[in-house]
Amino acid sequence: MKAQDLRQKSVDELNQELLGLLREQFNMRMQASTGQLAQTHTLKQVRRDVARIKTVLTEKAGA
């Protein structure tokens, strides 16, 4: 997910995507703690995607 693509979305779309990613991150954390998560690198990707969305939301709020 690129920040440039995120900037084209509306605030409502970004909030929905953020909520979905946070749920996904929670589920991944639970899987990682029980040893069921095979691809641990996805945790890092989701965390960075959340940060990108939050950054774009902050940019839109300031504009």
Curated annotation (Swiss-Prot):
Name the UniProt key words of this record, in alphabetical order.
Answer: Ribonucleoprotein, Ribosomal protein
* One GO molecular-function entry: structural constituent of ribosome
List this protein's GO terms for biological process: translation
GO CC, sorted alphabetically, is: cytosolic large ribosomal subunit
SUPFAM superfamilies hit by this protein: Ribosomal protein L29 (L29p)
**Superkingdom, taxonomy of origin:** Bacteria
User: By its UniProt entry, which InterPro entries does this protein fall under?
Assistant: Ribosomal_protein_uL29 (IPR050063), Ribosomal_uL29 (IPR001854), Ribosomal_uL29_CS (IPR018254), Ribosomal_uL29_sf (IPR036049)
Is Transit peptide among this UniProt entry's keywords? no
The record's annotation in PANTHER family points to:
60S RIBOSOMAL PROTEIN L35/50S RIBOSOMAL PROTEIN L29, LARGE RIBOSOMAL SUBUNIT PROTEIN UL29C
Q: Give the protein family.
A: Belongs to the universal ribosomal protein uL29 family.
Record protein name field: Large ribosomal subunit protein uL29
Q: Tell me the name of the encoding gene.
A: rpmC
